[in-house]
C-alpha cells in the first residue's frame, strides 16, 4: 500500500512540473492606441470644428462658379443645425491680402428652412474660382446660445486635429 502511495506521488510530480513549465498563454495585449475619432463631412467638404467638437461647419467649394457653401452641423456631422442669424463673415488670407466673405442664409422650401432659420449659408467670389487653398478665420458664429470666436482653419485642410 505504501508503494502504491509513493507511486501515485511519483506520477503526480511530473504532471505538476510539466504544468509549471507549460507555455504561458499571453497576457492581455498591450493596449492599442485609441481609435481616431473621425467625422465624415456629408457633402465631402472641409470640416471646421467649433469648440470641443460641439458643432461643425462643412465648407464645400464649387470652383466653377466661385460659390462656397457652409453647412452647419452637429458635433458628429450627422444632423443639420439651423441658425437664427441671417449671415456670418469669414476672413481669408489670399496672397498676403485679407478677403472678407459674407455667408448668407439660404431658404429651402423643401426643408422648411428660411432666412433666420437655416443650416445652409452661401457666398460667392471671383477669387474662389482660382484659389484652391487659404487660411481663414471665422470671427464670430452664434449657435444655440453659444458664440464661437476666432475660429481659425486652413481650406481645404480644416482644423480637426483628431
Regions found by a protein language model. Name each.
Residues 20-162:
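Intrinsically disordered, low-complexity terminal tails/loops enriched in metal-binding residues
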Residues 1-20:
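Sec-dependent bacterial lipoprotein signal peptides
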